[in-house]
Design a protein with these regions (language model features):
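Polytopic endomembrane small-metabolite transporters, centered on the Drug/Metabolite Transporter
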Residues: 1-4, 9-356
């Protein structure tokens, strides 16, 4: 009996030791799996951050270049609507050529894909018209001021309607810093000049249309599955009719195209950059939030003005230059707000109760 008891205890001890070894092995395996999962997530986040930075840089270079080339092209040709129309037509034509060449960049023409882009280009045309009216009744300083405040309203729209968390303190400071720095620049440059209620009305209409356009563009990239080249085609092709209307409405049809130095070269170059900015713009918009995309546009404008002042110091001012540099610096502090984590009760709804 003693021998059997000893053997039984030994067997139990062996079983406990084996169970402990198996438990330790399982714990180590789970820990390793968690570490591997964490490493994979960190690698994925790093790759995503690099992708975002790459397309922000590409889009910014195209945007800044486009501002300069457009000025040269319009200056040489004298017809801004013709320059814009040529850029739209070439961008749409490039996608069609790619499709006929077998690139497979265009999907089926369906109502559920076409109608949203009709709405988007309608907002674009209305925004362009209201911007022209705003510039007629206000000055450049007022328009730049409104544009610099735009990320704040876009940020609010994303929070209310697009399930984004509210930006952290650093990002709020960043957005406010851009506004204050731009205000200092404008106060020392042209100031803000608004001609009565009509000027304020058109400035507000343009501002709100642009804010909705920015957020709706992000909505398109998230909810309508298509290639970036399809987005390039739809936005450019559908913007041609409103541009033709503007061509006649502004009286450009009664003018002759000027034959300034390098007119054709600058026109062709603007069309090439137009294709690049169309693609990089949609690609950039698809990888970052609407607020970040709006802020990038503001910083591109401020950086271009800074470059112009430094290279062509006709109206150089230390205060203006430092204010511009500060606005860009504040903008670089911005970090994207993540999506809100759904709550157990009422998960997947915005603060206004709109389901996502």
């Amino acid at each position: 009996r003693d021998a059997r008891a000893v053997a039984t205890r030994g067997a139990r001890d062996d079983a406990r030791r084996r169970a402990k070894r198996l438990s330790n092995a399982a714990t180590i395996g789970a820990t390793n799996a968690k570490m591997s999962g964490d490493d994979a997530k960190r690698a994925s986040d790093a790759a995503s951050a690099r992708d975002k930075l790459l397309w922000i840089i590409i889009y910014s270079l195209c945007s800044s270049t486009m501002l300069v080339i457009n000025k040269l092209a319009v200056g040489a040709n004298g017809l801004p609507t013709v320059v814009a129309g040529a850029q739209l037509a070439v961008s749409a034509a490039v996608v069609v050529v790619m499709e006929f060449a077998g690139a497979g960049v265009l999907g089926p023409f369906e109502k559920k894909r076409i109608v949203p882009f009709v709405l988007y280009t309608t907002m674009f045309a209305m925004g362009l018209f209201s911007n022209m009216k705003a510039l007629m009744l206000t000055n450049v300083g007022a328009v730049i001021s409104a544009r610099c405040c735009l990320p704040l309203i876009v940020c609010s729209i994303e929070w209310f309607f697009m399930n984004r968390a509210f930006p952290n303190a650093r990002s709020v400071m960043s957005l406010m810093g851009v506004v204050v720095s731009a205000g200092i620049y404008i106060a020392n440059d042209t100031g803000v000049d608004i001609q009565g209620g009509a000027g304020m009305f058109w400035l507000l209409v343009w501002w709100l249309l642009l804010a909705v356009q920015m957020t709706y563009g992000k909505h398109l990239t998230e909810n309508i599955a298509m290639t970036q080249w399809e987005r390039v085609f739809y936005t450019n092709a559908m913007a041609i009719p409103p541009t033709i209307v503007l061509y006649y409405a502004t009286g450009e049809n009664e003018l002759e195209m000027e034959d300034g130095e390098g007119a054709m070269f600058y026109l062709i170059l603007s069309c090439v950059v137009g294709v690049a900015i169309s693609y990089s713009g949609w690609k950039c918009r698809s990888v970052i939030t609407a607020t970040t995309f709006t802020l990038v546009g503001v910083l591109n404008k401020m950086a271009t003005i800074t470059f112009t002042i430094i290279v062509w110091p006709k109206d150089f001012s230390v205060v203006k230059t430092l204010a511009l540099i500060a606005s860009v610096g504040f903008g670089l502090l911005y970090t994207e707000a993540p999506l809100r984590k759904p709550k157990v009760a009422g998960a997947g709804t915005s603060p206004l109760g709109i389901k996502h």
